[in-house]
Amino acid sequence: MNNALLDARLQQALGYTFSRSGLLQQALTHRSYGALNNERLEFLGDSVLNCSVARALYDAFPDLPEGSLSRLRANLVRQETLAEIAGALRLGDSLRLGEGELKSGGFRRPSILADALESLFGAVFLDAGFDEAQRVVRRLFDPLVAQIDPKASGKDPKTRLQEILQSRRLPLPEYRLVGTEGEAHDQSFIVECLLAKPVLSTRGTGKSRRAAEQEAARQACAELQR
């Protein structure tokens, strides 16, 4: 697939079409590829991301104190989460990487994927302003925010499940990707959460693998707390 088609697919998955295609190209260009790379856009996008996620949490959990909100935000914007969202968008297929990074599999490296996603947020901000950039961020992160149970000290379902099992001295869960649904630009991931003791299997569906894992963990928590 040529670059134009890959870029079109990425924009469709992102839910935003760039007016200035040069910004998209820059956001997708790693420093190993050329001088006009995405590092400055990443700097902008990091701020857009943090502000947008902070607002999402502020609106969703009016009773949570600042400390809990900060912990939740840190969990949502960490590299692992960003890389999984980037993977769901198939962002790696569109990256411009130098020959060395290509050979070493840089298009799969979590740090490169996470940085590129932040660069995209920065590029949308420059292309259309903060409101549109925030909309793009919220479209990707609101499903993760919706899975958080505020009654569980603001902890996400995977963390809660791990703590429940550890408190009972039971083995930790295993998460397996069962499959995907939908078109390439709008895929949903299906993940199974397996507990060895007590024997339990739950399934979750989400727009990213992480979101699906969280949903499967949420169901497992509910079963264990019955």
UniProtKB/Swiss-Prot annotation:
It comes from the Bacteria. Mg(2+) binds at residues 42, 115, 118. Its cofactor is Mg(2+). GO terms for biological process: mRNA processing; regulation of gene expression; rRNA processing; tRNA processing. It is an enzyme of class 3 (hydrolase). Its main location: cytoplasm. Residues 7-129 form the RNase III domain. GO terms for molecular function: double-stranded RNA binding; metal ion binding; ribonuclease III activity; rRNA binding. Digests double-stranded RNA. Involved in the processing of primary rRNA transcript to yield the immediate precursors to the large and small rRNAs (23S and 16S). Processes some mRNAs, and tRNAs when they are encoded in the rRNA operon. Processes pre-crRNA and tracrRNA of type II CRISPR loci if present in the organism. Homodimer. This is Ribonuclease 3. It comes from Thiobacillus denitrificans (strain ATCC 25259 / T1). The lineage of its organism: Bacteria, Pseudomonadati, Pseudomonadota, Betaproteobacteria, Nitrosomonadales. The gene is rnc.
